[in-house]
Amino acid sequence: MSYRKLQRTSSQRRALLRDLTTSLILNGRIETTEARAKEVRKTADQMITLGKQGDLHARRQAAAFIRNVVADVKEDGDDVVVTSALQKVFSELAPKYADRKGGYTRIMKTMPRRGDGAAMAILEFVD
């Protein structure tokens, strides 16, 4: 399987992809370079597929990759409900794409970045 090195060591590349994938899950869209967006698209689609499987093994695989970040905090009277990025994948995104067989994200190219002229893109979930 081929992948882009992104001018980083393997640990730095894995950390970058984990951070960008978690940000995409939390926010629904991110703006990054085109090469990074193409790599994050692969990992984001894998996380949605794991969410659709929904079993314990898939949940543990997704938990090993997605950062443990708070996605939402809601208050119901005395109770405080905290939702993590992992819970968002399994409770919101997986049911949303239950009848879709892939292609959960889209990449839209934007203007080059000012300063170094890097090709930029917006990566977002398909509605």
From Swiss-Prot:
GO terms for cellular component: cytosolic large ribosomal subunit. GO terms for molecular function: structural constituent of ribosome. It holds the Pfam family Ribosomal_L17. Keywords: Ribonucleoprotein, Ribosomal protein. InterPro entries: Ribosomal_bL17 (IPR000456), Ribosomal_bL17_CS (IPR047859), Ribosomal_bL17_sf (IPR036373). Transmembrane segments: none annotated. One of its GO terms (biological process) is translation. Part of the 50S ribosomal subunit. Contacts protein L32. Belongs to the bacterial ribosomal protein bL17 family. This is Large ribosomal subunit protein bL17. The gene is rplQ.
